[in-house]
Amino acid sequence: ACCSTSFCGFPICSSVGTCGSSCGQPTCSQTSCCQPTSIQTSCCQPISIQTSCCQPTCLQTSGCETGCGIGGSIGYDQVGSSGAVSSRTRWCRPDCRVEGTSLPPCCVVSCTSPSCCQLYYAQASCCRPSYCGQSCCRPACCCQPTCIEPVCEPTC
């Protein structure tokens, strides 16, 4: 199955996972989100009480137009080789305690372990916040491999 949506302002179509009604909810940009495969359990992350939205590691995300987010506009002269301009005014952040951050889109892909931390479990001092509630560990931190209750540690 192929899910069409956009991330960082660019349309993408990914065949990762499967499309189904089990991921539909108002905070998603589409009613059916990409679901993780058996080896990609960290691709989707719970939002609010139920269901989930897809993470950048799935090459599929949700718009997260509503819910907890940060306002503002971030522009980039060039993204990759396309030279396109990306402007995002709202993104998903389940933990409202981490506010006022401004990071480049898609920063998750540059992390050693993109699914190491999630903001509502991990310590803010240990994790670098990113889009859609997922965060990357800072160089001096290491988190549990699972996303159930990741905890930052001083060393790996």
UniProtKB/Swiss-Prot annotation:
GO terms for cellular component: cytosol; keratin filament. The modification N-acetylalanine is found at residue 1. The keratin products of mammalian epidermal derivatives such as wool and hair consist of microfibrils embedded in a rigid matrix of other proteins. The matrix proteins include the high-sulfur and high-tyrosine keratins, having molecular weights of 6-20 kDa, whereas the microfibrils contain the larger, low-sulfur keratins (40-56 kDa). It comes from the Eukaryota. InterPro entries: KAP (IPR002494). This is Keratin, high-sulfur matrix protein, B2B. Sequence repeats lie at residues 26-35, 36-45, 46-55, 56-65. The source of this keratin is lincoln wool. Disulfide bonds: none annotated. Keywords: Acetylation, Keratin, Repeat.
